């Protein structure tokens, strides 16, 4: 049913998203869900893309929104592409334009088209500095002092960049309340600001396999500074004598693939399988009882929410601010003090050996995952859209 919320000047409100490679990654996957939800609620939705990767859509996905091309290439905000975006916004009568990248020509585009622009940050605020913070903690004392000086310079540079985005954005979306609080504090924003919480959505499976196998799962990219899968291998070395009938499956890929396999050989790890990357994650969630993460930092990890939706109990380090939004009680996962590998190993063994506890937590994490439904996420987007449209009507 058409309402004032999805009408503008007697036509459907048109919301467009910008993407370089689509769909490719967590932000684009959420865009698919949000785009379909907005279409089903009476909005016109278009995704403008440079490279349309149709083979990357989830199996069985029915797309309701339009996808229209931009000039192909690798830089979304070159002068040539910026002009193409301007022309597309005017031609398609776009009311709200959503971007996940800090756009060089955003202010120019707004001036030329009058479009409302929404920036959505799909990482923690100032995530660009997290890897440097980790490197400082691991560095030799002399090198650490040099890195600390460099970090102060980088801090100031990125604060200016974030302030610039906040200045041109009509709305600034973040993934959870703790990210909003952090951004508000670090940028010294007023309490009534443009930052809004637009949480990730996770498709809820229609069938959840509760008959799990004795499998512990890692699923994600191989990226040393952030993911630290080497920690998981050392933890597995500790626990494998105590869990002889359990298996560790590592699903994913990246530049560390060869070195991690070599490390597993050096540690003489047993009952471990490197499965490689895959788009068919459901088959792994269906079998696994426990999900392991050993990251130094994360944003709002979709893999954690997907595991919960499929009844896989997570265990991970309490190493990033959004973790308590996903694991908000002891029944929704196991949090370990960073980065105590002995404590992690002890907790993992205890969880693996306690069938009754895992079964109880399995049901609880499935319930928790319902809070990530597209209806909840869509409602947050609808509230943001209403606010932006009402500013024009007011």
Identify the function of each model-found stretch:
Residues 343, 350, 357-371, 379-383:
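A short, well-ordered alpha-helix in the C-terminal region of glycosyltransferases
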Residues 28-33, 214, 223-238, 255-261, ...:
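A conserved mid-protein helix/loop that constitutes part of the nucleotide-sugar donor-binding site
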Residues 83-87, 139-172:
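Membrane-proximal helix-turn-helix segments that form the acceptor-binding/catalytic region
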Residues 99-105, 121-124:
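Short His-centered aromatic/hydrophobic patch
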Residues 178, 201:
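Carbohydrate-associated surface elements
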Residues 10-12, 17-25, 31, 37-76, ...:
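N-terminal strand-loop element at the rim of the active site
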Residues 317-318, 329-341, 350-355:
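Conserved acidic donor-binding segment of nucleotide-sugar-dependent glycosyltransferases
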Residues 277, 296:
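Aromatic "clamp/platform" in nucleotide-sugar-dependent glycosyltransferases that forms part
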